[in-house]
Amino acid sequence: RSFAKSTSPYDRNQLWRHSLATAMAAERIAKRLSLEADGSHFSAGLLHDIGKVALDSVYPDNFQEAVKRAVESQRPLYEVEPEIFGMDHAEVGGVLGEHWNLPPLLTEALRRHHTPDQAMLSPQLAHVTALANYLAYVAGYGESSNVGEHAYPMSSAMALKMDPGKFQDIIEELQQASERIDAMLGAVSAA
């Protein structure tokens, strides 16, 4: 099955905007920390919510029910998904990463972007992804199912030894990149 089309009312465009913003934030965090520029941070940010796309594509009615429950109960989607699917979108993303033979460090970042303290192979990549996810939300790149998912990831900031004062410039860069993100999405959807 292709992930390109969705029959559900879930706003896939907002998800991709958020994913691109998360990728850009992850890349900037990695640069500020002088981490290797190997593309893994950008890739983890871009793909971190791929499990949502899979769940929405394969089980659109169930996914909409999960989104509805999350909104109504004011809980994060990743807490509601296991009630319906037996696992959350992060775990689904990890399963997809394994199926696609993605590097294990990247697969772990997909699986642990909400639970970076549980990462074993590369806690650093998982923490960068979690923090980038948060910064993308703060910069205004969210979606309707993000209820509660944008809590400040204190453990990630501490693990990365990043001063929260350094976040504002990343947030501002993301806000200024809105047109560029929309252009990237337009180019992809036109292809």
Can you annotate each of these PLM segments?
Residues R1-E98, P104, E108-R112, A119-A132, ...:
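Acidic/His-rich, divalent-metal-binding segments that scaffold phosphate/diphosphate chemistry
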Residues M154-A191:
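Terminal helices and disordered tails flanking the catalytic cores of nucleotide-processing hydrolases
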Residues G142-A151:
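A glycine-biased, small/acidic residue-tolerant capping/turn segment at secondary-structure junctions
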Residues P103, P153:
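Residue-level signal for threonine
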